[in-house]
Amino acid sequence: EMNFTRTMHGVMRNIAHFCSRSKSRVWGKDGWQKIVVCIVADGRKKVHPRVLDAFPAMGVYQAGIAKNSINGREVKAHVYEYTTQVSLDSDLKFKGAEKGIVPVQMIFCLKELNAKKLNSHRCIFQRFWSTLNPNVCILLDVGTRPGHDSLYHLWKAFDTDSNVGGACGEIKAMKGKGWMGLFNPLVAS
């Protein structure tokens, strides 16, 4: 759950950054209303139970409601939607408006079966994007912690040049406290 909360808290901090841009023609105080965070869990039995425990804390998911079948038909996925005003940081501490967290619109799709990453991407693009009709889509893997304004800079690349069809950000290794992570050869390289 630490990887999930690290990523989710970073996304929520980025949404707060969008809302802090008071002189922007696009963003500002209510900028959060233009952003929807979609999370896909690839397989109900595959997702770690402690990750699922983080969702009710944010109000997005209720355990025990999802059923494997309805009227004899297999269920493919369960979709939950909520506008949360609470974040869990990587230390599993609650953060809210007092720490600069703004409301975040969330869609959580819990797939019954693990069908791998490409199927999850297709699920997002086919099922949600046709309804949401976004101008920009940013994909993040669990464990990636975006910098406080990195999603804004990715969005800005699309906003300033309509010919941009894709963009990627820079990935930096988390070095840990006192750079202790550098003792790990994978981090150090």
Curated annotation (Swiss-Prot):
Localization, per the record, is:
Cell membrane
Full protein name: Chitin synthase 1
| Catalytic reaction list | [(1->4)-N-acetyl-beta-D-glucosaminyl](n) + UDP-N-acetyl-alpha-D-glucosamine = [(1->4)-N-acetyl-beta-D-glucosaminyl](n+1) + UDP + H(+)
What membrane topology is given? Multi-pass membrane protein
Any single biological process term in GO: cell wall organization
Q: Where are the transmembrane segments?
A: none
GO MF term (any one): chitin synthase activity
Q: What is its EC number?
A: 2.4.1.16
Domain of life, per lineage:
Eukaryota
Spell out the GO cellular component terms annotated for this protein, sorted alphabetically and separated by semicolons: cell septum; plasma membrane
InterPro entries recorded for this chain? Answer: Chitin_synth (IPR004835), Chitin_synth_fun (IPR004834)
PANTHER family named among the record's database cross-references: CHITIN SYNTHASE, CHITIN SYNTHASE 2
> Which purpose does this protein serve, as stated in its record?
Polymerizes chitin, a structural polymer of the cell wall and septum, by transferring the sugar moiety of UDP-GlcNAc to the non-reducing end of the growing chitin polymer.
Q: Which family does it belong to?
A: Belongs to the chitin synthase family.
Q: Which organism is it from?
A: Tuber uncinatum
Which UniProt keywords are listed? Cell membrane, Cell wall biogenesis/degradation, Glycosyltransferase, Membrane, Transferase, Transmembrane
